[in-house]
Amino acid sequence: MTLYSPIVTESTDFKTYLIDNQGNIINSWLHPRGVASMPYLQDDSTLIYPYRVENPSMNIGGVGGGLSKYSWDGELLWSYEIANETYQHHHDIEPLPNGNILVIVYEKKSAQEAFAVGRQTIENPLNQIWAEAILEIQPVGMSSASIVWEWHIWDHLIQDVDPSLPNYGIISEHPELQDINYGSAGLGPPTTRPGGADGDWKHLNAIAYNEDLDQIAFSSRNHDEIYIIDHSTTTQEASGHSGGSSGMG
């Protein structure tokens, strides 16, 4: 069987299809908004569907902003949006065995915040860099959610330009940290993307969870890298460099 949601740009008929190996439709779901990445069919026959909100706070290809849960019969059971001045969901999600959902989000940082941690340039007229974070959200009721765990790339930076800053170090000796000066921070005129100027830095795409190891893996398109982080940590441990099963935060 195959589950898919066609990406259509000009339509009010957004659907998810479950088909068999002969292409016959087993079930379908109708949605008011277009898909952000890919849907997930759960063991209990519910569907988790990431969708593109009407007005994303950080706009670029693959942007989403909303999550919905449907019954097998298409009844909307839950819907929640992550599209505000701090966070913007984009690309993939990962439903967890406990019913929670891992969500990739942009985390907006100003040029001043970037310079304060050693960033040397901002390549876009927004004067922003869109960092990345992983949020574990727990659905609450019909339209709410709680963040029960989180990991922020901003807590794991290194730079070798300004020795007066606490994150100064030899980059090659710290593969667990991210060089704040690696890669461009978005695009501006005349090379803007269809959504306009942006602060996209790493551009995370896919996320997956390994239940046996309690680890999260995700990929960066812009930097051609795959990362693995420890999910056994507390949120406080995840912001540092110790604790958890790996002992590295």
Give, region by region, the residue ranges found by the protein language model.
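Histidine-/acidic-rich catalytic cores in large beta-rich domains
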Residues: M1-G249
